[in-house]
């Protein structure tokens, strides 16, 4: 259409909402007029038109993104499409965003600037919120009982709903545990060990709702695991394992007793004596998440599935969870 807009015409008919939210959101437009270069002194051009050139640009941009000391002065990050642009940044993650004078969209900034302050944990953030030292924050699930106190401090408290679910992805590429995860009955048994109702009520203070699958509950509604194909039922989990050749050792580690691919055997790729012991990578800094995984570890141990919980910062979590890494869950 012009130098800032283009059209996409599909050869088939698609649901517009699905196409926009599930396909177009995977396209990330990048400012070639400012970023299509391979060094600070290089002038933007069309190097991105070739695979080799695109890789060189990506390498340069990646290196610049890791240079946190010069983040707020690097001209690369001054190029923005939204109502705000980076004003100040410190290596610990504190960032000040200022209104962009060149933004001509409908949703222009209504404030001149705002500062995003990082915290080491949700408890640390909540302590600052209690003191009234910040304008906007959140109440962690484990602190919901203090809502009235926060309101007396002058804050307005509203639910932070999201159309989302929480799940634990399996690393099927892991050479040790991948063949185990590939067995459907293993995944079924593990789901039978998750007490969604109890976790929702006790750990998340009803800020999270049980669900039966990948489609999230409507925000604000009380979900239930009743009617789910894989309800909380440790007895079913134990039976599934025993029926497939595992020596279930409660509060120990369950091992494969009958290796093989036949009926009553552990399954393809699972060796005799293989253990149901896995490392779970979890995001650090969230008390309720820590408590949830402690509950899962306890529940899974009832049928001899050992979970070693390893908490890491968010950025490390994303890196470790890549399919080629050795993470298990």
PLM-predicted stretches and their roles:
Residues 1-62:
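Surface-exposed binding/hinge segments that line
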Residues 17-32, 81, 169, 179-182, ...:
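A structural "hinge/loop" feature
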Residues 72-75, 101-147, 285, 297-298, ...:
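Ligand-site clamp/hinge motif
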Residues 96-101, 182-298:
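Append "and occasionally in soluble cytosolic enzymes with long acidic Gly/Pro-rich linkers
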Residues 156-172:
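Periplasmic-binding protein-like
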């Amino acid at each position: 259409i012009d130098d800032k807009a283009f059209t996409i015409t599909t050869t088939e008919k698609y649901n517009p909402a699905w196409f926009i939210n599930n396909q177009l959101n995977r396209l990330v437009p990048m400012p070639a007029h400012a970023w299509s270069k391979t060094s600070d002194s290089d002038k933007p051009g069309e190097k991105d038109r070739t695979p080799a050139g695109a890789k060189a640009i990506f390498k340069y941009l990646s290196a610049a993104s890791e240079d946190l000391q010069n983040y707020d002065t690097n001209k690369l990050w001054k190029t923005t499409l939204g109502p705000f642009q980076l004003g100040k940044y410190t290596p610990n993650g504190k960032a000040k965003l200022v209104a962009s004078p060149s933004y001509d969209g409908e949703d222009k900034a209504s404030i001149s600037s705002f500062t995003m302050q990082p915290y080491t944990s949700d408890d640390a953030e909540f302590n600052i919120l209690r003191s009234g030292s910040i304008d906007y924050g959140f109440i962690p699930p484990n602190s919901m009982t203090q809502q009235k106190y926060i309101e007396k401090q002058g804050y307005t408290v509203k639910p932070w709903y999201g159309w989302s679910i929480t799940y634990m992805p399996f690393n099927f590429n892991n050479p040790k545990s991948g063949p185990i995860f590939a067995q459907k009955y293993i995944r079924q048994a593990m789901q039978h060990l998750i007490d969604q109702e109890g976790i929702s009520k006790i750990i998340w203070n009803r800020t999270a709702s049980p669900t039966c699958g990948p489609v999230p509950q409507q925000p604000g509604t009380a979900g239930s695991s009743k009617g789910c194909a894989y309800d909380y039922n440790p007895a079913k989990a134990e039976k599934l394992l025993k029926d497939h050749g595992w020596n279930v050792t409660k509060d120990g580690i369950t091992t494969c007793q009958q290796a093989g691919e036949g009926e009553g055997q552990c399954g393809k790729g699972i060796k005799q004596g293989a253990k149901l012991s896995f490392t779970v990578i979890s995001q650090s800094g969230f008390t309720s998440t820590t408590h949830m995984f402690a509950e899962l570890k306890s529940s899974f141990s009832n049928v001899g599935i050992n979970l070693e919980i390893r908490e890491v910062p968010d950025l490390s979590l994303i890196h470790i969870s890549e399919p080629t890494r050795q993470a298990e869950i």
